[in-house]
Amino acid sequence: MSITQERKQKLIKEYAITENDTGSSAVQCAILTERINNLTEHFKFNHKDHTSRRGLLILVGRRRRLLNYIKKNNVSEYLDLISKLGIRKIK
């Protein structure tokens, strides 16, 4: 369910703005998207796991708030990020 340290480092390198950037909004959204995708795969086989489903909803809400922040501050960065992550626009 969780992502490996190697996968997390790869995401950080891919979405980082500078070399030592590990906490920017884009990096956080990428890591949250990876965790959300892993949980979505988990629910295909464990559809009665309601505790993890609540965790999924919390992660989706956190990602939505981060994306709203990015959209408010830099629309072009927001559009680039959602296209790279493969997610839909926020209304």
Curated annotation (Swiss-Prot):
Q: Which GO terms describe its molecular function?
A: rRNA binding; structural constituent of ribosome
Q: Which Pfam families match?
A: Ribosomal_S15
One GO BP annotation of this record: translation
The source's domain of life comes to: Bacteria
Keywords, alphabetical:
Ribonucleoprotein, Ribosomal protein, RNA-binding, rRNA-binding
Gene Ontology terms, cellular component aspect?
A: cytosolic small ribosomal subunit
The record's PANTHER family line, in alphabetical order, gives:
RIBOSOMAL PROTEIN S15, BACTERIAL AND ORGANELLAR, SMALL RIBOSOMAL SUBUNIT PROTEIN US15M
> What is the annotated role of this protein in its UniProt record?
One of the primary rRNA binding proteins, it binds directly to 16S rRNA where it helps nucleate assembly of the platform of the 30S subunit by binding and bridging several RNA helices of the 16S rRNA.
Q: How does it assemble?
A: Part of the 30S ribosomal subunit. Forms a bridge to the 50S subunit in the 70S ribosome, contacting the 23S rRNA.
Q: Which family does it belong to?
A: Belongs to the universal ribosomal protein uS15 family.
Q: What is this protein called?
A: Small ribosomal subunit protein uS15
Instruction: Give the organism, scientific name.
Output: Rickettsia felis (strain ATCC VR-1525 / URRWXCal2)
User: By which gene is this protein encoded?
Assistant: rpsO
